[in-house]
A protein has these predicted regions:
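Amphipathic, charge-rich alpha-helical segments that serve as recognition/docking helices
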Residues: 92-190, 200, 207, 214
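Short, charged/polar connector segments at secondary-structure boundaries
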Residues: 2-107, 113-127
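Amphipathic alpha-helical extensions and coiled-coil-like segments
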Residues: 169-170, 175, 179-269
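Residue-level marker for well-ordered alpha-helical positions
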Residues: 57, 88, 166, 192-193
Length: 269
């Protein structure tokens, strides 16, 4: 019996069938246009805070007098409108300055590409809180790992492009942090918001905070209440002890209180 031959047919996608070549080319090109600020939604789970501080007041005044000088970066949403990639502060300043539109670069980006570009553009800020780094590094690392499982737009596997380096190694090189420091920052995402805010406010330093991130949410809530009532925070040594009791299933309010009230040589490490 003659061996059947496999027929390879490259069928056009739905996008190819129902759009013109000009429309497809336009979709893959970036362009600048003025967009209503009401058509632009914030990036989902945007890790960087947009605060009303002195710098924001300066930005509002500049936008009021001169407009937005550097266009924001957005991508089109499948459901209509646009999603902000870079320019959340400029958008807020435009709103408060009474502007209806702002100039934007519209770029065609996949979900993972959008995450990476969003993080990279915001890491250029002069001041970045530990919580912002924590969630930004986690979001970018997850996106890089997903890209490593498939081919990117250049059709070259990421592992091949970076000679077998792990995503965490690549991220560390890009942001100037060691792999261990990347891991520590990402651990902070396991903290409850109240304790994470204490890290941002420099009431708890990084090393104790990492140890505390291994506690359950319920244990963290008890710890936070204890810190508030006793007006104290754990040292690194105390945090290690607290984590040990938690791992052994022996951590409760009384144990926490006894550890927190232990004399320590230095309150802040």
């Amino acid at each position: 019996m003659a061996k059947s031959r496999e027929i390879n047919m490259n069928l056009p996608s739905a996008d190819d069938l129902f759009t013109t070549q000009e429309e497809r080319d336009h979709k893959n090109q970036e362009y600048v246009k003025d967009i209503s600020i009401y058509e632009i939604t914030d990036f989902p789970n945007h890790p960087f805070k947009v605060k009303m501080d002195d710098k924001m007041l300066e930005t509002i005044e500049s936008v009021r007098d001169h407009g937005v000088l550097v266009p924001a970066l957005v991508r089109e949403k499948p459901t209509g409108g646009y999603e902000m990639i870079s320019g959340h502060r400029r958008k807020m300043a435009s709103e408060l300055a009474g502007k209806e539109t702002m100039p934007c670069i519209v770029r065609n980006l996949s979900d993972d590409q959008a995450v990476i570009v969003m993080v990279d553009s915001n890491l250029q800020r002069e001041e970045i809180l530990p919580s912002e780094k924590a969630f930004a590094y986690k979001m970018k690392l997850d996106a890089m790992k997903r890209q490593g499982q498939r081919r990117d737009l250049t059709s070259v596997p990421l592992a091949q492009k970076f000679k077998g380096k792990t995503s965490r190694e690549i991220l560390g090189e890009q942001v100037g942090e060691s792999q261990d420091q990347i891991r520590r920052y990402i651990r902070l995402t396991e903290l409850i918001p109240e304790i994470l805010e204490m890290v941002d406010d420099k009431k708890i330093s990084m090393r104790p905070a990492v140890e505390l991130s291994y506690l359950t949410k319920e244990e963290q809530e008890i710890l936070y209440d204890t810190m508030e009532s006793e007006a104290c925070t754990p040292s690194h040594a105390q945090a290690i002890k607290i984590r040990k009791f938690s791992a052994e299933g022996r951590l409760n309010e009384d144990v926490l209180l006894s550890i927190m009230l232990e004399e320590k040589p230095n309150q802040v490490e």
